[in-house]
Structures are given as structure tokens and as C-alpha cells.
Regions:
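CheY-like receiver
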Residues: 41, 49-125
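Generic detector of well-ordered alpha-helical packing
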Residues: 8-9, 55
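Acidic, metal-coordinating helix/loop segments flanking the phosphotransfer/catalytic sites
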Residues: 17, 32-50
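Two-component/phosphorelay signaling modules centered on CheY-like receiver
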Residues: 9-34
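Structural motif
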Residues: 22-25, 43, 68-69
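Non-catalytic signal-transmission and effector/linker regions of two-component phosphorelay proteins
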Residues: 1-2
């Protein structure tokens, strides 16, 4: 499964990358972005199965990225230090919402949900 991370906080980004490489070696990180603008650019040049995104970014919120896309053919995991964005994340189609800091258990639960959806999509395309 290919993934991108959209996170502006270096510590949180390093934590996510560490958890993914240690516990989810099957996930290939295609790149990371630190803003709405760079997130849109990264999505235009990659085809991720999974996007893990912080909500609050320097130039907006992650939902701004999704609003600028015609569709999003990837699974979305939203991460935030605030629970107030959870309903928006679910309404927009996120597979899960994780409160920071992400842990192995919370990330594993979210990734397992995403894997089910990605596998289902692959089977339907065959």
C-alpha cells in the first residue's frame, strides 16, 4: 500500500514515519507535505492508496485539500490534537480520526480499516 503524509509538525511527522516503518513495513511512503498547497501538489504527482493528514496546516485545514479535488480515490486517516474536527472528518469520508499523538494501536486500527477498503477496491477493479 502506498501512502503520503500531510503534517506540518516535525515531531509528529517523525513519529508517524517511525511507527509506519517499524510496524507497517508493507506501507511505502511516497512523500510528505507540510501545507495545503504542498499537499495538493503531492497528490497531483502521486497515486497513494492512503493519505494520513493533520487537520490544521499553516495555510488552511486538510479539508481544503479535499475540497479542491474532483474526487479522492484514496483512504483518508485524519490526525489532530483536537477532537472538534472529528465530525467534519467523518462527513467528508475519512476512514478514521486519530487524536495526537498517534500510537501503534490507534494507527494499527485505522490502517486495518484502510487496508480492508483498499483490498476491496482492488478486487472490484479486477
Amino acid at each position: 500500500m502506498n501512502a503520503i503524509i500531510i503534517e506540518d509538525n516535525t515531531i509528529d511527522l517523525l513519529n508517524l514515519e517511525s511507527l509506519l516503518s517499524k510496524y507497517f513495513p508493507e506501507i511505502v511512503i511516497l512523500g510528505h507535505a507540510t501545507s495545503v498547497k504542498s499537499g495538493i501538489e503531492l497528490l497531483s504527482t502521486t497515486k497513494p492508496d492512503l493519505v494520513i493528514s493533520d487537520v490544521q496546516l499553516p495555510d488552511g485545514v486538510s479539508f481544503d485539500i479535499l475540497n479542491q479535488l474532483d474526487s479522492f480515490p484514496f483512504q483518508l486517516i485524519v490526525i489532530s490534537a483536537f477532537d472538534s474536527y472529528a465530525m467534519n472528518a467523518i462527513k467528508i469520508g475519512a476512514i478514521d480520526y486519530i487524536l495526537k499523538p498517534a500510537t501503534r494501536v490507534t494507527l494499527e486500527n485505522a490502517i486495518n480499516k484502510a487496508k480492508v477498503q483498499v483490498d476491496q477496491k482492488i478486487r472490484m477493479e479486477q
